[in-house]
């Protein structure tokens, strides 16, 4: 699929072709947290859960002293704090570390906890190996059976220096030729896209497709329209109509392969989208300078 000449993704090297013609498609899962009740509540705390084939998103509006604990966590998970006013204490086997807002943290397997120090929003990202959380997702029924065309989840290599708490500021300025702000760990990739102030230029959209992995687009601020188109296959009974779905914040769109898709910000103010991939994307990882912590996590 062609990108605008100034889009950094125009320089991506195409991956090996998937030797399989699809015979069926999954639909797009849209989870608009602002339209549905939370999946969990306690005094001053509301949590919503949504999932893709491999990834779980837990979105929480939390009060001070709320604690989120994980016992026997099977793999690395991610904590995303998009608001600068937020702060937490993260406890792992190494001890306690204070993390301010506008940070992303990669939390190791095993025992850990997150204690909220300032009221605000937080996002925790897990793989579906966290079976207890997968059951809580509002769209869990959509994944009662695996979706077609998605490759099985396989984690990436263990970091050479071992699993430990890693934290990174989201305050990374845009750079010519780099796409967004990307971090990866052994389980997933997070692309905290450059903020879009006002609507996107509709003459510079980016329709593209993925052969065998989902793209999960998390809207944390603003309003977006997700444009989705499925290819035609011989079986007309499997054809799907185009979609042009407006999603405000906070919301999740799970975009399935091999649909052609592009997303445009339409909000008048700040529009912030975060793209998630589980496991990490190889093509993004192969681009020099794109993954900001690539020196810590090897590729397969």
Describe every region a protein language model picked out.
Residues 203-209:
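Active-site environment of non-heme Fe oxygenases that use a 2-His-1-carboxylate facial triad
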Residues 1-56, 131-201, 299-300:
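A short, N-terminal "cap"/entry segment at the start of jelly-roll beta-barrel domains
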Residues 51-52, 71-73, 209-211:
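A short catalytic or substrate-binding loop motif that flags glycine-/basic-rich loops and adjacent residues
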Residues 57, 211-214:
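Generic structural microfeature
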């Amino acid at each position: 699929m062609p990108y605008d000449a100034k889009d950094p993704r125009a320089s991506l090297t195409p991956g090996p072709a998937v030797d399989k013609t699809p015979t069926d498609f999954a639909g797009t899962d849209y989870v608009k947290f602002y339209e549905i009740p939370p999946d969990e509540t306690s005094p001053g705390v509301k949590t919503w859960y949504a999932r893709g084939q491999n990834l779980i998103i837990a979105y929480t509006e939390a009060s001070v002293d709320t604690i989120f604990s994980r016992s026997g966590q099977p793999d690395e998970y991610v904590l995303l704090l998009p608001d600068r006013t937020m702060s937490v204490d993260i406890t792992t086997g190494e001890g306690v570390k204070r993390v301010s807002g506008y940070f992303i943290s990669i939390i190791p397997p095993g025992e850990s906890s997150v204690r909220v120090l300032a009221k605000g929003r937080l996002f925790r990202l897990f793989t579906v190996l966290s079976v207890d959380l997968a059951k809580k997702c509002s769209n869990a029924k959509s994944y009662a059976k695996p979706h077609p065309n998605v490759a099985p989840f396989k984690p990436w290599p263990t970091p050479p220096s071992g699993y430990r708490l890693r934290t990174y500021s989201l305050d990374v300025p845009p750079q010519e030729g780099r796409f967004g702000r990307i971090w990866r760990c052994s389980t997933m990739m997070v692309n905290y896209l450059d903020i879009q102030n006002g609507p996107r230029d509709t003459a510079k959209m980016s329709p593209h497709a993925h052969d065998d992995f989902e793209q999960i687009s998390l809207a944390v601020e603003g309003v977006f329209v997700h444009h989705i188109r499925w290819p035609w296959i011989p079986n007309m009974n499997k054809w799907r109509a185009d979609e042009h779905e407006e999603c405000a914040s906070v919301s999740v769109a799970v975009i399935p392969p091999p649909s052609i898709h592009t997303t445009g910000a339409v909000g008048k103010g700040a529009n912030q989208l975060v793209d998630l991939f589980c496991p990490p994307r190889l093509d993004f990882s192969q681009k020099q300078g794109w993954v900001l912590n690539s020196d810590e996590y090897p590729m397969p």
